Amino acid sequence: MNNPSETNKSSMESEDASTGTQTNGLDFQKQPVPVGGAISTAQAQAFLGHLHQVQLAGTSLQAAAQSLNVQSKSSEESGDSQQSSQPSSQPPSVQSAIPQTQLMLAGGQITGLTLTPAQQQLLLQQAQAQAQLLAAAVQQHSASQQHSAAGATISASAATPMTQIPLSQPIQIAQDLQQLQQLQQQNLNLQQFVLVHPTTNLQPAQFIISQTPQGQQGLLQAQNLLTQLPQQSQANLLQPQPSITLTSQPTTPTRTIAAASVQTLPQSQSTPKRIDTPSLEEPSDLEELEQFAKTFKQRRIKLGFTQGDVGLAMGKLYGNDFSQTTISRFEALNLSFKNMCKLKPLLEKWLNDAENLSSDSTASSPSALNSPGLGAEGLNRRRKKRTSIETNIRVALEKSFMENQKPTSEDITLIAEQLNMEKEVIRVWFCNRRQKEKRINPPSSGGTSSSPIKAIFPSPASLVATTPSLVTSSTATTLTVNPVLPLTSAAVTNLSLTDQDLRRGCSWEVLRSLPDRVTTTAGTTDSTSNNNTATVISTAPPASSAVTSPSLSPSPSASASTSEASSASETNTTQTTSTPLPSPLGASQVMVTTPGLQTAAAALQGAAQLPANASLAAMAAAAGLSPGLMAPSQFAAGGALLSLSPGTLGSALSPALMSNSTLATIQALASSGSLPITSLDATGNLVFANAGGAPNIVTAPLFLNPQNLSLLTSNPVSLVSAAAASTGNSAPTASLHASSTSTESIQSSLFTVASASGPASTTTAASKAQ
């Protein structure tokens, strides 16, 4: 190798610019350039050793570096086999002289460097080694990626400033020399290249170098190598060397080799991006397909074709059978874009043909659509067009249906003429509407709900417990139950009880309207019940004479007396019970306890499938007195809690007294009666009296004790007040008396009306009627 002292031999060339030499078929022209500096032979060798990506032609070597200006002289190899390939027109003086090789640099400056023959031989060997590596890569395409990676590493090293290049070369140079000798023996023509720095604005036309056909053939081989390399490997190869690039362009008969700028490199080397024109137009195509599918479905339904008919007709016409599912998926946009694009022209053609044939055959025959042109077999079996009824017509039909659910043929014809509809359509609509009505309101199996239910239950036992003070009889025991509607109903119902222990029948009437005042009160413990009676207007005549009972004062109990009067006679009945109350009463409730009615209640339970403990509460529920009965288990056997409408009595009483509670009774208040609170007596009892001369439901004071009337308190209860004696009303006294000394001895009366509005409840036993 050359020592560094040989670098002193290099001097700046400023000789004539017209003298040219020819080496290996290449013409070089010397150019005067300013002196830029000299480099050592080792540095030149290191620089040339890294140019694995450079294509070389003959003995000419041209390299580019931004920070170096190098010009070297190359000598002609005497005795080399390549000298025989030199043109015979070369002057002898030029052959004996040492030719110079110019290295064209990026800055446009050229400097000459004179090298010894040994140095020139070394440079030539290195250049030939690079060409051999490139040719070997052509032959071995399987290892092209590895060569590309190695070239990328070497190119990156070549792109660095020369100051960073080591002065010593690896052992690879020796291997390259051996390969170069083999190439020289094969007389391989090397290619011609010009290196230009990427920042140079020179045009490729400035570097047109003529070469022999053998050189062109070698260049084509190199070009094929670059073409065969994968695009990804080229991209990886070009990324590490942004400062030195090479672009080859084929020309005829010459080859133009130039460098492109860094900015244009990715565009020239990488694969150009494909402009996907269909993708840009795809949204519009999708919109067009969607619109066509919607229009196709509407027009198909208008023509009266099913999806299956369309598929069969298209098979008859165009030879492509489509199933009903395919047509359905097309209309629902569930097919792929490609399949929809294929199917659209066929459907469009069929639709146009169908519409044209339909318009042509409208005047002639409605069945012309079943012609063979549209697939007669498929279209002959198509369904009848579905009838769509407008809203106003539907409302008119509903009104007609409410008037008459089963119209006659004449009625249907009249309705069809009025609505401008087909008679068959109207007939089918009424038939479907009747079926719908049956589903909504199924008919009851037990008959109509408006018909009364009457049942007679014989009772082997007596209705009322027999006591020595009561008069018995042998009258048969029957129980007649009719469904009792609420008090607001217009129906007149009754509940009649006939007992063998009673001389007469006790009838409770709930009338729609009464001409006079109707009151029912409970009498005192006085044995003369005639002084404490109230009149009840009833349509049922009396059955027998009055039956009285002895005084009940020895035993604290509650007695209830009901009277029934008519224009013919008057009957009074007194009944004694001794069933204690286990629980307090609630608001808007009537307590009825008659242990003697247990047997009849049991018979009613069996018939109505009621619970065993329903007792009279179940009877009242079955009779329709109230749907909101309390649980019968809270009361003694035979007791019932009848809850009536809160508005029957609460609307007539004073709001100050009623508050949120309601005094309820079996009978409602009279039409315009009121109960004003007149005064409080000395004992704290409330006194209700008539308001002036206006007609009133209460003809005599009604006494309430709000402090002591709670049924669970231990205080004695007294509803009889001295204020009753001071009343000057000449009408029959209507009063209620219930006395008790303890909770255990409290007896329940036949009619007990409770209103619990707070800790101290108010209780009255007055029953009114509407």
From Swiss-Prot:
<keyword id="KW-0539">Nucleus</keyword>
<dbReference type="InterPro" id="IPR000327">
    <property type="entry name" value="POU_dom"/>
</dbReference>
<dbReference type="GO" id="GO:0005667">
    <property type="term" value="C:transcription regulator complex"/>
</dbReference>
<keyword id="KW-0597">Phosphoprotein</keyword>
<keyword id="KW-0238">DNA-binding</keyword>
<comment type="function">
    <text>Transcription factor that binds to the octamer motif (5'-ATTTGCAT-3') and activates the promoters of the genes for some small nuclear RNAs (snRNA) and of genes such as those for histone H2B and immunoglobulins. Modulates transcription transactivation by NR3C1, AR and PGR.</text>
</comment>
<feature type="modified residue" description="Phosphothreonine">
    <location>
        <position position="277"/>
    </location>
</feature>
<feature type="region of interest" description="Disordered">
    <location>
        <begin position="1"/>
        <end position="33"/>
    </location>
</feature>
<feature type="region of interest" description="Disordered">
    <location>
        <begin position="68"/>
        <end position="97"/>
    </location>
</feature>
<feature type="compositionally biased region" description="Polar residues">
    <location>
        <begin position="1"/>
        <end position="26"/>
    </location>
</feature>
<dbReference type="InterPro" id="IPR050255">
    <property type="entry name" value="POU_domain_TF"/>
</dbReference>
<dbReference type="InterPro" id="IPR000972">
    <property type="entry name" value="TF_octamer"/>
</dbReference>
<keyword id="KW-0010">Activator</keyword>
<comment type="subunit">
    <text>Interacts with POU2AF1; the interaction increases POU2F1 transactivation activity. Interacts with NR3C1, AR, PGR and HCFC1.</text>
</comment>
<keyword id="KW-0804">Transcription</keyword>
<feature type="region of interest" description="Disordered">
    <location>
        <begin position="519"/>
        <end position="589"/>
    </location>
</feature>
<dbReference type="Pfam" id="PF19536">
    <property type="entry name" value="POU2F1_C"/>
</dbReference>
<dbReference type="GO" id="GO:0045944">
    <property type="term" value="P:positive regulation of transcription by RNA polymerase II"/>
</dbReference>
<feature type="modified residue" description="Phosphothreonine">
    <location>
        <position position="271"/>
    </location>
</feature>
<feature type="region of interest" description="Disordered">
    <location>
        <begin position="357"/>
        <end position="385"/>
    </location>
</feature>
<dbReference type="GO" id="GO:0000981">
    <property type="term" value="F:DNA-binding transcription factor activity, RNA polymerase II-specific"/>
</dbReference>
<comment type="similarity">
    <text>Belongs to the POU transcription factor family. Class-2 subfamily.</text>
</comment>
<feature type="region of interest" description="Disordered">
    <location>
        <begin position="262"/>
        <end position="285"/>
    </location>
</feature>
<dbReference type="InterPro" id="IPR045703">
    <property type="entry name" value="POU2F1_C"/>
</dbReference>
<feature type="compositionally biased region" description="Low complexity">
    <location>
        <begin position="80"/>
        <end position="97"/>
    </location>
</feature>
<dbReference type="Pfam" id="PF00046">
    <property type="entry name" value="Homeodomain"/>
</dbReference>
<feature type="compositionally biased region" description="Polar residues">
    <location>
        <begin position="262"/>
        <end position="272"/>
    </location>
</feature>
<dbReference type="InterPro" id="IPR017970">
    <property type="entry name" value="Homeobox_CS"/>
</dbReference>
<dbReference type="GO" id="GO:0043565">
    <property type="term" value="F:sequence-specific DNA binding"/>
</dbReference>
<dbReference type="GO" id="GO:0006366">
    <property type="term" value="P:transcription by RNA polymerase II"/>
</dbReference>
<protein>
    <recommendedName>
        <fullName>POU domain, class 2, transcription factor 1</fullName>
    </recommendedName>
</protein>
<dbReference type="InterPro" id="IPR013847">
    <property type="entry name" value="POU"/>
</dbReference>
<dbReference type="GO" id="GO:0030910">
    <property type="term" value="P:olfactory placode formation"/>
</dbReference>
<dbReference type="GO" id="GO:0005634">
    <property type="term" value="C:nucleus"/>
</dbReference>
<feature type="modified residue" description="Phosphoserine">
    <location>
        <position position="451"/>
    </location>
</feature>
<feature type="compositionally biased region" description="Low complexity">
    <location>
        <begin position="519"/>
        <end position="580"/>
    </location>
</feature>
<dbReference type="GO" id="GO:0060235">
    <property type="term" value="P:lens induction in camera-type eye"/>
</dbReference>
<dbReference type="GO" id="GO:0003677">
    <property type="term" value="F:DNA binding"/>
</dbReference>
<keyword id="KW-0371">Homeobox</keyword>
<feature type="modified residue" description="Phosphoserine">
    <location>
        <position position="284"/>
    </location>
</feature>
<feature type="compositionally biased region" description="Low complexity">
    <location>
        <begin position="357"/>
        <end position="372"/>
    </location>
</feature>
<dbReference type="GO" id="GO:0045892">
    <property type="term" value="P:negative regulation of DNA-templated transcription"/>
</dbReference>
